[in-house]
UniProtKB/Swiss-Prot annotation:
Cofactor, free-text remark: Binds 1 pyruvoyl group covalently per subunit.
Purpose: Catalyzes the formation of phosphatidylethanolamine (PtdEtn) from phosphatidylserine (PtdSer).
Documented EC number(s): 4.1.1.65
Cofactor(s) demanded: pyruvate
Keyword Transmembrane helix attributed: no
PTM (free text): Is synthesized initially as an inactive proenzyme. Formation of the active enzyme involves a self-maturation process in which the active site pyruvoyl group is generated from an internal serine residue via an autocatalytic post-translational modification. Two non-identical subunits are generated from the proenzyme in this reaction, and the pyruvate is formed at the N-terminus of the alpha chain, which is derived from the carboxyl end of the proenzyme.
Enzyme class, spelled out: lyase
High-level lineage: Bacteria, Bacillati, Bacillota, Clostridia, Eubacteriales
Active-site feature positions: D113, H169, S256
Keywords: Cell membrane, Decarboxylase, Lipid biosynthesis, Lipid metabolism, Lyase, Membrane, Phospholipid biosynthesis, Phospholipid metabolism, Pyruvate, Zymogen
Gene Ontology terms, MF aspect: phosphatidylserine decarboxylase activity
Entry protein name: Phosphatidylserine decarboxylase proenzyme
Cleaved signal peptide residues: none
């Protein structure tokens, strides 16, 4: 059971997990773990399933998925009957008023819909994956010099579940460098998997880019793929000026993760998010929602 803090209602919601029984079997049984290592974490499996999700045959899954997870159709730019494949639905666009952007330059917004952990004054050699499991930023980036720039900074970890809006956005005006791609495996990023696979984020396929933001310093975006995520698509143009709320990219089918790193003394994360992280609970956030302020 995954409990997520609802910031508006100030209560804990129980997350309904897509493929819950399947995930438990894969990551908790000897047979499932063997199947995971031999097939599921491999590129060919995600590529094969990705092709199915791109096909017109997968479109029949859309309506049931929306109903099962109570996803708000009113936010979509298309009717559910207009999606040509499951991926077409998965990386759907939303109406302009579905995720309003706070234009105040001192306000830090969420880059995506998801579940958020926040870590301040980070030790880049002992970043928290889950309680008891850590990884290092230089392992994640394979770039020690860049990693050291974020000593004592802030790490924001956004977990995107399959039910979420899967486009991600810029948190400020600025210029973003070209993404650096790092090949890897395709483990799930569900908490069930995070508790079982050491250094999972360093194992999975990922991309990172440096965003030279106008108000929050040099922000490091790390986009991590997961099981069945055939592609991480960057839709921005590198080294061209963007404005707060502009789209940066999207994930194809599967759960996925976005990790933001801020330099020391650049931001203050909202108190409730920090408190819930310390208690071991994620906070549910929407793209454009206030999550902190400029220091």
């Amino acid at each position: 059971m995954i409990k997520v803090f609802n910031r508006k209602e100030k209560i804990y919601d129980i997350e309904k997990v897509a493929g819950d029984n399947y995930l438990k079997w894969i990551y908790s049984s000897p047979v499932g773990l063997n199947f995971l290592e031999l097939m599921i974490k491999k590129k060919f499996f995600s590529k094969l399933y990705g092709k199915y999700c791109d096909s017109k045959h997968s479109a029949k899954k859309v309506s049931k998925f929306i109903d099962d997870f109570n996803i708000n159709e009113k936010e979509f730019t298309l009717k559910k009957s207009d999606f040509k494949s499951f991926n077409d639905f998965f990386y759907r666009k939303l109406n302009n008023d579905a995720r309003p952007i706070i234009n105040d330059e001192n306000i830090l917004i969420s880059p995506a819909d998801g579940r958020l952990f926040a870590y301040e004054n980070i030790d880049i050699h002992n970043l928290i994956q889950v309680k008891g499991l850590t990884y290092s930023l230089d392992e994640l980036l394979k770039n020690i010099e860049l990693a050291e720039k974020y000593i004592g900074g802030t790490c924001l970890l956004f977990r995107l579940a399959p039910v979420d809006y899967h486009r991600f956005h810029f948190i400020d005006d600025g210029i973003c460098e070209e993404a650096v791609k790092i090949s890897g495996s395709y483990y799930s990023v569900n908490p069930i998997a995070l508790e079982k696979v050491p250094k999972l984020f360093c194992e999975n396929k990922r991309e990172y880019s440096i965003f030279h933001s106008k108000h929050f310093g040099d922000v490091l975006y790390v986009d991590v793929g997961a099981t069945c995520v055939g592609s991480i698509i960057q839709t921005y143009t590198p080294n061209e000026y963007v404005v707060k709320g502009d789209e940066k990219g999207y994930f194809k089918f599967g759960g996925s993760t976005i990790i933001l790193f801020f330099e020391k003394d650049k931001i203050i994360v909202d108190k409730d998010i920090v408190e819930q992280t310390q208690k071991g609970f994620e906070c549910k956030v929407l793209m454009g929602e206030k999550i902190g302020t400029k220091l």
